């Protein structure tokens, strides 16, 4: 299994690297994994781009220091602060029409196992009006001024092409207030219900405030003991 670490020098180049990796998995039949911290950005899903308030939402993101981009998978807008960890598990598939649900279910279990290894009591689910709402999300009790409440830590998406499937997602490590602050006007412009208090983080759930540790935990859970070769992308300014 190929383990790809680091990120490319620009957001566009970084997204291109993942697309190229998906094609390489389809061509070679060798699975691959990435777990890294993307550049600071606000990534909109394809549904967002069709909303009447899309340009207003892009402006709100830009005003708050989050360059807006569009991602190829579905789902709603996601904010990356620079400490947010993304992951992508890429596997060859013989039939692109089957296995979708099984891959989603397995991915939830993998994220829960990774968070468990970091001391977090995570489970499948999400509180109401969460960011990027979906059936395959992970939540955990997070510290608040009034005690603890379940908050969303991770969301999962999937893309399938001829010969390969990519299950990807995002895990909020820290900066939950900043994420809530930028997503609030963005989701409002898109007409999507959103509660900023639904945003959790690994740190608020009692785990490490360290994106490198979170990335390696996700990587280890996805690899699951398989033999690996480690490769690095080109941005020397970031290890993860």
Predicted regions and their residues:
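Acidic, polar-rich N-terminal leader regions of halophilic archaeal proteins
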Residues: 1-240
